[in-house]
């Protein structure tokens, strides 16, 4: 199996102060905001495959990920086996088996995604039902409406008008994953085998968390039809409840950022523009 090659300068993982884990070799360099290393090492006298995450980007919260995974006791979450004394700098988790949906469906020409999206939505609803006391999710720019000039420069002022006029009357709070998009979900035999990356998790906005999972990213080959979105939502609503109008609102809010992020992708930008025209009626 081909692993991601080194793509930028990063810390030397062999310099980390491991306590429970002995690093043998680095076998891959997954793309991520933080420095992430796919490695082999020794844990409890056995050779294991693991991932090392080292804080790099602004807002990294290794401690939140460690504490959340310990609190929720979710079998699909990674098992964290080592970290620094302050839980601020790095953590090591055992590798989970599975593939991302993007790898499984390829160009999705045969609509293979339809076999997965019901369970995808159902899994998020189950996470949202998690009980406990959690810190509030950290504030993110995506939670807020950009100023009017931002929309004018992009030629979509009507989206600004929609967002200002249709703001949700309340925020429905629950435990949120914070980044439940397809790259953080692994699958085996058409079932979810792992849920990754709990750094952004906490007590937050249920419908925003759903919308974040639903939006199409640049280059993504699924979740670009109403049939797929409805299937995800059917799965969600089989386990939980939500306000569908709020979900739609937050999809538009997030897309207002991704319209600019994906501006060099003509096909993607056209898709998002059509979503605006359809939803912002």
Task: Locate the predicted segments by residue.
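A conserved alpha-helical element in kinase catalytic cores
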Residues: 46-91, 106-123
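A cross-family kinase active-site recognition segment
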Residues: 99, 104-158, 171-173, 202-203
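Protein kinase-like catalytic domain
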Residues: 73, 128-132, 218, 237-240
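Active-site acidic catalytic loop and adjacent metal/ATP-binding pocket
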Residues: 35-40, 164-208
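Juxta-kinase regulatory segment immediately upstream of eukaryotic protein kinase catalytic domains
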Residues: 1-26
């Amino acid at each position: 199996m081909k692993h991601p090659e080194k793509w930028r300068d990063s810390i030397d993982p062999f310099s980390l102060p491991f306590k429970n884990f002995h690093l043998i070799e680095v076998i891959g360099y997954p793309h991520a905001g933080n420095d992430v290393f796919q490695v082999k090492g020794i844990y409890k006298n056995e050779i294991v495959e693991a991932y090392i995450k080292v804080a790099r980007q602004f807002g990294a919260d290794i401690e939140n990920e460690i504490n959340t995974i310990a609190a929720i006791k979710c079998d699909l979450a990674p098992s964290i086996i080592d970290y620094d004394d302050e839980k601020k700098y790095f953590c090591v988790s055992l590798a989970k088996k599975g593939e991302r949906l993007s790898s499984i469906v390829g160009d999705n020409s045969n609509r293979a995604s339809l076999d997965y999206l019901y369970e995808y939505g159902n899994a998020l609803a189950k996470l949202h039902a998690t009980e406990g006391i959690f810190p509030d999710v950290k504030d993110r720019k995506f939670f807020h409406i950009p100023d009017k000039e931002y929309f004018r420069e992009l030629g979509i002022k009507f989206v600004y008008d929609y967002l200002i006029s249709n703001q949700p009357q309340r925020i429905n709070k629950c435990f949120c994953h914070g980044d439940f998009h397809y790259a953080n979900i692994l699958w085996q035999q058409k079932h979810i085998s792992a849920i990754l990356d709990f750094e952004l998790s906490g007590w937050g906005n249920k419908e925003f968390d759903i919308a974040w999972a639903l939006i199409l990213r640049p280059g993504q080959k699924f979740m670009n039809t109403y049939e797929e979105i409805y299937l995800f939502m059917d799965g969600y609503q089989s386990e939980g409840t939500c306000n569908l109008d709020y979900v739609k609102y937050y999809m538009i809010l997030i897309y207002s950022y991704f319209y600019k992020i994906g501006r060099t992708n003509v096909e993607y930008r056209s898709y998002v523009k059509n979503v605006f025209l359809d939803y912002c009626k």
